[in-house]
């Protein structure tokens, strides 16, 4: 019966638009295998961690992370702030959206960066929580 109710909720819930990304808010958030705090906690996502929205229920959101894993998170733990996570071993963040532009800083794999501006091209303007801004190649990050 429990499984049947769960299945009904999944079918009845409106599916999120493909490519809708959110981020974990100001505090780390537990990620569950079902939409309940009584479910198994899979891992704790760090603050500002980007996630792709898959399904939304009233108080819960099913998300996909950078590794492709699916989990449930309480909606109250999500933020509308757009972030990306570095997937390259080391991403160059440059002053302009050009390969030859001055290097502002480098970000290691797993570092979350706030999206300031989504360009139509191959670059994304980002903000490091240390205050530095610059452009990173879109193929070096996940969350777009």
Where are these regions (language model features)?
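N-terminal signal peptide c-region/cleavage motif recognized by signal peptidases
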Residues: 12-14
